[in-house]
């Protein structure tokens, strides 16, 4: 039987019979920081390395990787993002890696565990003048992890985005 336990900003998924374990940090962008499936370690805790320096297993949105000089053009309009990788003059990995997600749904039974998390951003950011909401759904089974991400544009204008998942 799967169980889901929450302790402050950490969700743990367990199934002793199937050797499944997962640990999600709500206050680190809903990142999956540990994962074992069928007794095999897939994602290992990187302690003593700090999450803020590694972005380990973080969901990357609205852009993955680096935007050189933080500059991009969309619909013939130029935008300037804040530079958060100063030594290389890049905007890096988007905006949600340090945001706190809210638990919307938790379901656990003998075959799987499902967790749905939500983050709503109503603040306009430098270089990204759009609002959005994000749903992240993790489904754990004995031999698989399924990750679904749903982005809803809550603005009146279309916006560019990509989604990535940091190793």
Language model regions located:
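Surface-exposed acidic/polar loop and edge beta-strand patches at domain peripheries
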Residues: 1-150, 154-163, 167
């Amino acid at each position: 039987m799967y169980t889901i336990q929450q302790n402050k900003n950490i969700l743990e998924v367990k199934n002793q019979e199937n050797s499944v374990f997962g640990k999600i940090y709500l206050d680190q962008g809903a990142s999956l920081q540990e994962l074992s499936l069928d007794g095999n370690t897939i994602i290992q805790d990187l302690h003593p390395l700090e999450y803020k320096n590694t972005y380990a297993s973080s969901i990357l949105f609205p852009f993955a990787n680096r935007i050189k000089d933080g500059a991009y053009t969309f619909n013939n309009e130029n935008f300037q993002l804040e530079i958060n990788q100063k030594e290389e003059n890049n905007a890096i990995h988007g905006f949600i890696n340090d945001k706190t997600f809210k638990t919307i749904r938790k379901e656990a039974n003998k075959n799987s565990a499902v967790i749905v998390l939500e983050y709503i951003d109503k603040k306009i950011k430098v270089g990204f003048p759009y609002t959005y909401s994000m749903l992240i759904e993790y489904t754990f089974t004995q031999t698989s992890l399924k990750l679904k991400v749903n982005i809803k544009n809550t603005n009146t204008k279309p916006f560019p985005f990509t989604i990535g998942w940091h190793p």
